[in-house]
Amino acid sequence: MISLRFQPSTTAGVLSASVSRAGFIKRCGSTKPGRVGRFVTMATAASPLEICVKASITTPNKLGDCPFCQKVLLTMEEKNVPYDMKMVDLSNKPEWFLKISPEGKVPVVKFDEKWVPDSDVITQALEEKYPEPPLATPPEKASVGSKIFSTFVGFLKSKDSGDGTEQVLLDELTTFNDYIKDNGPFINGEKISAADLSLAPKLYHMKIALGHYKNWSVPDSLPFVKSYMENVFSRESFTNTRAETEDVIAGWRPKVMG
């Protein structure tokens, strides 16, 4: 198990084992060009939340390809909540993990000494405990784009080019394109919200998996879908928490080949 500690507000983190390292925290990876790295001491940082996430199956010590884990991490990043990320090999789940997550599922987050599963429950708890900045999506907008993921999976798994699954996906994307055209740039207008943080990782998987396995991409006739994806994928919170392309491809392989 690898533990990575992050302080989103300072873009800083530390690689650790079972014992936390004192001193400075620095996010793993390179700093952006022209940007000076900033550091905070452990003593002045807020106590990080512990979160168990899927580990990469292609690269040691990297975040894996779970879109639901990324949804929670995006929420923490956007709210500047520091977190201690524990990467779990889901193909060989350790005993300590099964004790806190008997079903063996990720993500799970520790709130007040209690481990909480389910990305929807976790993000709601984060909204209640860390209300600023507010990320809740109004109920009437919360389901926008919610059918895209299932239709993407249906098309990805399809082995019959004439079964209509591609058109079903295109219909959902067209509906979303028209919505963003009239209401964007995000689902709740000018500011990103929980619905975007849920949808963005799924669109990322759609882009990579369909590009690799179907040689398919969002058509130019849906410019607002494409601009939406560019907007969310380019956010620092997203680049900090996205899976490697190779992991997304490997993660979907069993569903495609099965």
From Swiss-Prot:
The active site is at residue 66. GO terms for cellular component: chloroplast; chloroplast envelope; chloroplast stroma; plastid. Coiled coil: none annotated. The modification S-glutathionyl cysteine is found at residue 52. One of its GO terms (molecular function) is glutathione dehydrogenase (ascorbate) activity. It catalyses: RX + glutathione = an S-substituted glutathione + a halide anion + H(+); L-dehydroascorbate + 2 glutathione = glutathione disulfide + L-ascorbate. Disulfide bonds join 66-69. Partial S-glutathionylation and intramolecular disulfide bond formation between Cys-66 and Cys-69 in the presence of oxidized glutathione (GSSG). Could be reduced by TRX-dependent process. It is found in: Plastid, Chloroplast stroma. One of its GO terms (biological process) is L-ascorbic acid metabolic process. Residues 130-258 form the GST C-terminal domain. A motif (Glutathione-binding) lies at residues 66-71. Gene3D superfamilies: 1.20.1050.10, Glutaredoxin (3.40.30.10). Keywords: Chloroplast, Detoxification, Disulfide bond, Glutathionylation, Oxidoreductase, Plastid, Transferase, Transit peptide. Residues 56-129 form the GST N-terminal domain. Residues 1-42 form a transit peptide. Its EC number is 2.5.1.18, 1.8.5.1. Monomer. Interacts with TRX3. Displays a dual function. As a soluble protein, exhibits glutathione-dependent thiol transferase and dehydroascorbate (DHA) reductase activities. Key component of the ascorbate recycling system. Involved in the redox homeostasis, especially in scavenging of ROS under oxidative stresses. Belongs to the GST superfamily. DHAR family. This is Glutathione S-transferase DHAR3, chloroplastic. The lineage of its organism: Eukaryota, Viridiplantae, Streptophyta, Embryophyta, Tracheophyta. The gene is DHAR3.
